[in-house]
Amino acid sequence: MAATATEKLPQLKSAVDGLTEMSENEKSGFINLVSRYLSGEAQHIEWSKIQTPTDEIVVPYDKMANVSEDASETKYLLDKLVVLKLNGGLGTTMGCTGPKSVIEVRDGLTFLDLIVIQIENLNNKYNCKVPLVLMNSFNTHDDTQKIVEKYTKSNVDIHTFNQSKYPRVVADEFVPWPSKGKTDKDGWYPPGHGDVFPSLMNSGKLDAFLSQGKEYVFIANSDNLGAIVDLKILKHLIQNKNEYCMEVTPKTLADVKGGTLISYEGKVQLLEIAQVPDEHVNEFKSIEKFKIFNTNNLWVNLKAIKKLVEADALKMEIIPNPKEVDGVKVLQLETAAGAAIRFFDNAIGVNVPRSRFLPVKATSDLLLVQSDLYTLVDGFVTRNKARTNPTNPAIELGPEFKKVASFLSRFKSIPSIVELDSLKVSGDVWFGSGVVLKGKVTVKANAGTKLEIPDNAVLENKDINGPEDL
């Protein structure tokens, strides 16, 4: 270590020792992360060693064997499964308070409602007990504990645990912010979803699931509506003894920054844009060379997680995330669960249909899933067969639509978009009910004017800049 790093660590360590809000596991995990960061163990990728993974490493979904119609085989597979949803995020970017998973998605049902309905249907149909586990952060824990009470009568065992709570570090002094009197939530941060492995282990839940005969955990973001239990993938992993599987899907131009899987020195590895040397960034973004990206749907063997966490072997790439909060420059160090792939034996990717990646990150995504482009059956959001184009319409809504409440108030009803290619809306625009959008549509209200799209209007390949264009 450099001299400064050698001085920084003991000073930070003694400050962390005095933070009573942290458990011993959190303290050692945090110091471990910081010392790796200070030692500069950032992983440098040698571009010339990168190889495109073969079909053995990234298995095409349609080449996987189907699961038989025999209900006993399905039950056998499901009895080995735990479903874990990453539930640490807040709905703040969409103007909502509380966990993002309680935003209403469709028909009055929230992300969490849909997840519970899906698992309950599996449990009822196959007479099994697939548990649902929610990994909360300190930001979402209290609210989530209250929310899950509504599911006590459902046929799903719901477990919750908290991911680690680490102190933000004041950048110029390199001390934990809470040690300097920052006692509210802003002094802390959850260290990314790479923390799922040690936190699941430290919660005691991992050992409990192993003792019940569970073998695999399916991890996914709670806002990905496409991340449903897939027996074909589970069967493949059990048969082939794959300790880790990452679902990837073909890139579109919207996904050029997403992490991709590569073969590197004989191992399968996640390559993120932050690891790419500047001179190769355009190549990384090319859909020709790097054709797939990580959906963050992950299937991981529970025994393998236990073994690797106990050996302290999961040294994922550190993502430094500098921020300015209340005028103070702070640093938070994070890791990603997908980067763990290279530590597991017999790890694979599976190239899945795009339908398994349907994230709701903004109100433009809500417009898609609330429209006639999708229907809701048994908690599953399925695509309307009437849409012939395999890709979804590109939707851009202006800042007036950013918050869920504003978005909902500006549409009397969600327009029909089955035949829409792209929609761009900006300014003070209001939609009536029964509106149909087709082809490429742009609606722009000039500054200071309110533009109302009348009930039952059909807009096909139109640029609307005022009432005269309707």
Swiss-Prot record:
Expressed in roots, rosette leaves, cauline leaves, stems, flowers and siliques. It comes from the Eukaryota. InterPro entries: Nucleotide-diphossugar_trans, UDPGP_fam, UDPGP_trans. Disulfide bonds: none annotated. Its EC number is 2.7.7.9. Disruption phenotype: Reduced number of seeds. The double mutants upg1 and ugp2 display severe growth defects and male sterility due to the absence of callose deposition around microspores. GO terms for biological process: callose deposition in cell wall; pollen development; UDP-alpha-D-glucose metabolic process. CDD domains: UGPase_euk (cd00897). Substrate binds at residues 88-89, 193, 221-223. Gene3D superfamilies: Hexapeptide repeat proteins, Spore Coat Polysaccharide Biosynthesis Protein SpsA, Chain A. The modification N-acetylalanine is found at residue 2. UTP binds at residues 86-89, 100, 163, 192, 223, 361. It is found in: Cytoplasm. Its main location: cytoplasm. Induction: By sucrose. GO terms for molecular function: UTP:glucose-1-phosphate uridylyltransferase activity. It catalyses: alpha-D-glucose 1-phosphate + UTP + H(+) = UDP-alpha-D-glucose + diphosphate. Converts glucose 1-phosphate to UDP-glucose, which is the major glycosyl donor for polysaccharides. Acts redundantly with UGP2 and is essential for the synthesis of sucrose, starch and cell wall, and callose deposition. Involved in the regulation of the programmed cell death (PCD) induced by the fungal toxin fumonisin B1 (FB1). Belongs to the UDPGP type 1 family. This is UTP--glucose-1-phosphate uridylyltransferase 1.
